[in-house]
Amino acid sequence: MKHTLIALACALTLSTAISTLGADAKLKYSYVPNHFDKDPGGQSQGPCHGGAALDEAGNVYVTTDTPRGITVFSKDGKFLRAVGPTRVHALEIRKENGTEYIYAARPSDHEVLKLKLNGEQVWKIAASDENQNFPDKNKFNPCAVTVAPDGSIFVADGYGSNYVLKFDKDRKFVSRFGGPGAEEGKFNTCHGIAFDSRQDKPLLLVCNRNNNRVEYWDLDGIFVKVIQKDLRMPAAVHIRGNYAVFPELQGRVTILAKDGSIAAQLGDNPKADQRANFGLPPEQWTEGITNSPHGASLDPDLNVIVSEWSKFGRVHKWAVQK
């Protein structure tokens, strides 16, 4: 009986430990130096605005402002190919009916695109489209896009109107919410957005960049709550399992657990003059220290990929410690 109780206690302890790790545990990371090809295809990676996403195979897609468009790396960091248009600001990869697609925001071109993984365009939402009836079309400079399971499209117009615009699955304008301001329920550069299914009801997780906070909104555009404040210009968000990663333009990367607590912070740059510094030359970079994190993604093992806003192009990897 004694041995049975001991075994049961051990099993419960192990179960609790696994449950904690799978839910809201702290995460530890080690930096992986020189993981990505420095000069993919024999050319400089930059300039990059700095979006990053992963496909199901683990390939890494990084946006550039070069004629190559989006550079694609293997999970081992080897350059594979270049696809799609240049000047993509942020991107999300989503699987639909067995096929993966890229959703891309292009603020300087005033459009949102749906692309195949080879870069072929499927459709676009553009201010120039006469069939679109959304307001402030002359201010349409979208920073990011996400898609709900029902096909609804949410566009963070952070460089334009400072509203999040909602379109139905057929790309027809439905509504908008937010608007410019510093108070709760308003945006000062809504710069990143993701659909979040981890809570009791589906929500949108929005990076309110210049207000230095991340927050929840419901799918009808009702403000729910601030999740974390006093961040350093959160630029984007990617969710994997119980965790969400936020690259902060002011030289840091933060990972939040499902409950909003801080699970890890990476690449913290103590030098204020190097933060959000597009032109910082490579000879001033420090291994494992970020300068201008702009896009990020978590792989299935919770390893972290970060792309920077950089004239020269800079992509990082941190490996989770198990």
Regions from the PLM with identified roles:
Residues 23-45, 278-286:
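A short helix->beta-strand "capping" segment at the edge of beta-propeller domains
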Residues 30-37, 80-85, 122-129, 174-179, ...:
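Beta-propeller fold detector
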Residues 33-68, 312-314:
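Beta-strand-rich domains and repeat architectures in extracellular enzymes and scaffolds
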Residues 41-57, 85-99, 130-152, 182-203, ...:
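Beta-rich, blade/repeat-based domains predominating
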Residues 59-62, 101-103, 152-156, 203-206, ...:
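Conserved beta-propeller blade signature
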Residues 65, 107, 158-160, 198, ...:
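Short loop/turn segments immediately following the C-termini of beta-strands
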Residues 71, 113, 123, 154, ...:
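WD40 beta-propeller blade core
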Residues 289-322:
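Blade-level signature of beta-propeller repeat domains, shared across WD40, Kelch, NHL, RCC1
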